[in-house]
């Protein structure tokens, strides 16, 4: 039995998150690295099995994911399905459809001096990966990178957001049902647990969150020479040109993009720049859109 998972699933209340004991983190990572060193994750068959397991986990537990998202974020079932669950189901299906072609080596031209040798680009797994998920899309932005890592032949440690305990507890309960402990593990907690995770060398660290924390993660990853991907926040301005024939439709789309997921989307419209002659109309149409959507 995976010691991390068994210790993390002790919470009886979905709104309470039990941190993973610090002393269990490193032994589990070492076990996963030993498994990876056997090279069994490189095959097409293994990768497909893992993605299919993720797909089954999602489709068989949709109501549980919806309930967890409602508990953590107050997200209704329709929005949960649209922005979190269905997107991951579709991602799994796309990976299964295209994985064989993604795994093919690419032939490249070789200089005459190297003949009869030939050159090719091979796409290799990176090793055991760490995915640190955010609070705003705790399913999509956590499991999305996990799906990619598994498809690329990498075991994964998942660190869900401690701000979404219901989703974290659900993942802790479901993951060992669908994945071997050497393949996917869940580590729960906050700063101490994340700090302990970052003391290890990783094949890749994928972090989604704020710029402030991203700088910390990047610094910790540099200490072990672990490659890191940072998906951070930013600015998403909108520019409204002087002559817009469909002002009402445009404002509806702006308000929808700003209000979906309570505005907690990294590419949500941030601010609007418009010609002064359109300012009053833009404000009026946006107010109307808000009233229609939320009355």
Residue ranges and their predicted role:
Residues 1-120:
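N-terminal Rossmann-like NAD(P)+-binding subdomain of aldehyde/semialdehyde dehydrogenases
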Residues 2, 37-56, 192-217, 267-295:
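Aldehyde/semialdehyde dehydrogenase
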Residues 16-19, 212-295:
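ALDH superfamily catalytic-core signature
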Residues 108-116, 186-189, 253-254:
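Short gly/ser/thr-rich secondary-structure transition/capping motifs
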Residues 110-178, 182, 225:
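Conserved small-residue-rich beta-alpha loop and adjacent elements
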Residues 154, 159-161, 188, 208-209, ...:
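Short beta->alpha connector loops at strand-helix junctions that form conserved
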Residues 169-176, 191-204, 212-223, 239-245:
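Active-site pre-lysine segment of PLP-dependent enzymes
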Residues 185, 208, 231-233:
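Short beta-strand segments
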